[in-house]
């Protein structure tokens, strides 16, 4: 069950990613989801807090976009996640 968290959406050069930094029963985790391929680029990774999760998710997304689309990560607009 989600306690709290944030997410951001990125659409660049044909890529569509969702970045997450969330606190749940397992702790605080960061992850990056590829909407186009319906797969996780960076599955849940344990982090210290929501802010560190945002940084880790952004770093994974930035590396992915440079590698596959030769594109920069645009400024992120983080939104609050809905809790269950």
Report residues per predicted region.
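Short N-terminal "domain-start" leader segments
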Residues: 1-29, 83
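Mixed-charge, Lys/Arg-enriched low-complexity segments
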Residues: 33-84
């Amino acid at each position: 069950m989600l306690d709290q968290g944030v997410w951001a959406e990125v659409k660049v050069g044909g890529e569509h990613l969702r970045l997450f930094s969330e606190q749940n029963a397992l702790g605080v985790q960061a992850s990056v989801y590829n909407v186009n391929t319906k797969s996780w680029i960076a599955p849940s990774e344990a982090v210290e807090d929501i802010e560190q999760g945002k940084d880790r998710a952004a770093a994974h997304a930035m590396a992915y976009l440079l590698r596959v689309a030769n594109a920069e990560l645009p400024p992120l607009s983080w939104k609050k996640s809905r809790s269950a």
